Amino acid sequence: MNAVFVDTGGWMACADRSDPAHAACTAARDATLEAGRLLITTDFVVDETLTLIRFRLGLAAANTWWQQIDGSARLRWESVENDRFERARNLFVLYRDKDLSFTDCTSFAVMRELRLTTVITTDGHFRQVGFDVLPATRPRRTRTPRRS
């Protein structure tokens, strides 16, 4: 599939001009679109992003972001339903040595199903599990996993 996944970190960096990765993530998103590639995200990522923008940047910024992505012909939302949810749960257990969010695991499950290899994000976890990350800059530090 000629598409690139966009994770919460990528969306947040694009939305927040004060984010250190703003220019790089915006450039990666724009280059992806200019190359004629589709952006793909999930309902879980949209939920997480909308909530983060709302609490970090305010309700007006959240509404602006929503209007920009809602109905875009260049963006496809994938729903995390029963089978995908179960695959994400299995990944959540499989990667117990990493400090992952469940939303990360839902993204991994969808990306694998759709055979997507590239993601726009600031989250280093995607690189840790084998995906190509845009922008190709050093990822933000991730927390040290807790021992179970």
How would you label these PLM feature ranges?
Residues 108, 112-148:
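Acidic, PIN/NYN-like endoribonuclease modules and their adjacent C-terminal/linker elements
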Residues 1-41, 54-68, 135-147:
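Short, well-structured N-terminal submotif of metal-dependent ribonuclease cores
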Residues 43-44, 104, 123-124:
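Short secondary-structure boundary segments
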Residues 75-118:
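Active-site neighborhoods of divalent-metal-dependent phosphate/nucleic-acid chemistry enzymes
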Residues 10-11, 47-52, 87:
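A general alpha-helix detector
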Residues 29, 46, 66, 104-107:
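Alpha-helical structural signal
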Residues 35-36, 72-73, 129:
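Structured helix-beta-strand junction loops
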